[in-house]
């Protein structure tokens, strides 16, 4: 029953994996974000319409008809793999064209990300005075540190920083909302990612009997071959941790050149891992096991690179929250009825599940 419900859930978008951006009703909110990472702009009004105006033009265009923007049930706007060119104004209007909420978003170029690790003695960029049609201060506005990506054992944490410009006596603005149509090339005008070592105790309240994904991979059975693994639910906005045969993979080792058999993708915050040799790879999001990738010899040329199967084991609560989001009310109702009428003897008992998918 649980496996069936999970397969139903997997057919729906993993909205929980995307960053939710909110703004008070009737307000205008300004955000700096990173290109390449999905976000959802909240509106929460039935049958609302979304309009967009880029930083290069004043004309509003309907977002509902664009391939890179999708209006979700409830009228929130999903932006998949946003580009720097999508920097601009996003306006949510009701059916009378009255403003419900408005976002000014600067999607800063992830390809320009400046990366430093505190424990390697690397320093982030400092403040810099520039002349951009007048004297301004360019600086980095930092998000809070994310949680440590491991507990009990040594781990790492990261924080994101965004490029901001401040004029004398004026409120700071994200760099490319400030510059708009101006074409300026300067190495200081870019976002940042800072890393450092950490160690924290485990949360004893964390649940351990939840499903996680398991994949069998056949991509490493030839010399000089490699595979690109993707951790479900991971993003640059969340703590992510990888292990190879139970040994931790760290940003410090990678940035210092000590890791040669794996490459964590910096621009996705570790969501993707490039591997060059067979091993059992496991990924964790917010300290919780999400997926395991098992090396398996190729049995036939026609076999898919990912082979699904199901077996029992432990997992954690991140995927439970995803399940609650993706299951429809009707599925929950039917599931509850079956549990009450058909599966009454086993209802209420915790069972661990491993879900293996293509």
From Swiss-Prot:
S-adenosyl-L-methionine as UniProt keyword: no
Keyword Signal attributed: yes
Extracellular topology ranges: 18-322
Protein location: Membrane
This protein's encoding gene: Fam187b
The protein's name in its UniProt record: Protein FAM187B
InterPro entries: FAM187A/B, Ig-like_dom_sf
Keywords linked to the UniProt accession: Glycoprotein, Membrane, Signal, Transmembrane, Transmembrane helix
């Amino acid at each position: 029953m649980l496996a069936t419900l999970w397969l139903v859930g997997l057919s729906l978008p993993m909205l929980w994996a995307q960053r939710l951006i909110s703004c008070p009703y009737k307000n205008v909110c300004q955000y700096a974000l990173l290109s390449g990472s999905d976000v959802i702009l909240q509106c929460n009004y039935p049958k609302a319409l979304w309009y967009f105006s880029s930083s290069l033009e004043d004309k509003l265009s309907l977002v509902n008809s664009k391939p890179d923007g999708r209006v979700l049930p409830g009228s929130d706007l999903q932006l998949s793999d946003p580009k720097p060119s999508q920097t601009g104004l996003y306006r949510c209007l009701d059916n009378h064209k009255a403003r419900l909420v408005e976002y000014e978003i600067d999607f800063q170029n992830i390809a320009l990300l400046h990366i430093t690790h505190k424990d390697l003695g690397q320093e982030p960029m400092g403040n810099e005075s520039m002349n951009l049609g007048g004297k301004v201060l360019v600086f980095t506005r930092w998000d809070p540190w994310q949680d440590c990506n491991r507990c009990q054992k040594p781990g790492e944490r990261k924080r994101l920083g965004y490029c901001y410009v401040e004029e004398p006596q004026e409120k700071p603005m994200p760099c490319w909302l400030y510059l708009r149509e101006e074409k300026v090339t300067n190495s200081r005008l870019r976002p940042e990612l800072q890393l450092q070592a950490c160690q924290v105790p485990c949360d004893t309240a964390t649940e351990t009997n939840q499903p996680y994904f398991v994949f069998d991979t056949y991509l490493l059975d030839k010399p000089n071959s490699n595979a690109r693994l993707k951790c479900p639910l991971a993003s640059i906005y969340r703590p992510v941790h990888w292990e190879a045969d139970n040994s931790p993979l760290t940003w410090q080792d990678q940035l210092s050149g000590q890791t040669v058999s794996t490459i964590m993708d910096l621009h996705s915050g570790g969501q993707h891992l490039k591997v060059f040799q067979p091993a059992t790879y496991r990924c964790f999001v917010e300290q919780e096991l999400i997926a395991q990738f098992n090396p398996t010899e190729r049995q036939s040329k026609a076999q898919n690179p990912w082979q699904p199967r199901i077996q029992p084991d432990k997992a954690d609560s991140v995927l439970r929250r995803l399940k609650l989001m993706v299951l429809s009310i009707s599925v929950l109702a039917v599931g509850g009825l079956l549990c009450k009428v058909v599966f009454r003897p086993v209802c209420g008992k915790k069972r661990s599940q491993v879900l293996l998918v293509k």
